[in-house]
Design a protein with these regions (language model features):
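N-terminal structured subdomain of primase-like DNA metabolism proteins
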Residues: 1-93
Length: 93
């Protein structure tokens, strides 16, 4: 079982732009980042990441969320698996 403090540390530490940047090539666009959707085959970037709000939105598929939900969607992980993945990435365990 994952401790509540580990979950809190993951949400405090994981930067959405760093997590997504491991899978998607992001380009700075004002205060946000944009890139091609990892969930669809597209030529024009419709995938946006907001470091300020710590959220992402894929306008081609309608999906969006935070660093944890991105890992869940992209890697087909459960919530506990995504938390464990991010805890390991940020050396929180």
């Amino acid at each position: 079982m994952i401790s509540k403090s580990t979950i809190e540390q993951v949400f405090e530490t994981a930067r959405v732009e760093e997590v997504i940047g491991d899978f998607v090539q992001l380009k700075k666009s004002g205060s946000n980042f944009k890139g091609l959707s990892p969930f669809s085959d597209e030529r024009s970037p419709s995938f946006m990441v907001s470091p300020v709000k710590q959220i992402w939105k894929d306008f081609s598929s309608g999906k969006g969320g935070n660093a944890v939900t991105f890992i869940m969607e992209h890697e087909h992980f459960t919530y506990p698996e995504a938390i464990k993945y991010l805890a390991k990435k940020y050396m929180l365990t």
